[in-house]
């Protein structure tokens, strides 16, 4: 996976970088949410997210759960912290849409 792929997945959920507050920019100039903004967006949806570096595998793991719940609702693994954060947000948004249907 790459940051470009994670961002494509996020955009496919309807996310827009028009409000670039708390965003960085990829090599193509597209805005993507920083890990701090991703945490804010998870909180607005009623979830908490934790992003950890897994030294043994040289990767990052983002996991999330509903606030007050003991078990993770989902998790992703990626090469970098921003990539894991963006892809986690894409998966959360996709899951929320599916839950509303």
Question: Locations of the language-model features?
Answer:
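N-terminal segment of the canonical double-stranded RNA-binding domain
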Residues: 2-71
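Short, compact, well-ordered microdomains
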Residues: 59-98
């Amino acid at each position: 996976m790459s940051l470009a792929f994670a961002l494509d997945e996020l955009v496919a959920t309807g996310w827009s970088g028009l409000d670039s507050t708390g965003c960085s920019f990829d090599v193509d100039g597209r805005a993507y949410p920083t890990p701090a903004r991703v945490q804010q967006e998870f909180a607005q949806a009623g979830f908490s997210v934790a992003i950890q570096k897994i030294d043994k595998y040289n990767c990052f793991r983002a996991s999330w759960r509903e606030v007050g719940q003991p078990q993770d609702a989902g998790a992703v693994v990626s090469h970098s912290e921003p990539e894991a954060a963006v892809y986690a947000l894409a998966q959360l948004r996709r899951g929320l849409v599916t839950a509303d249907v």
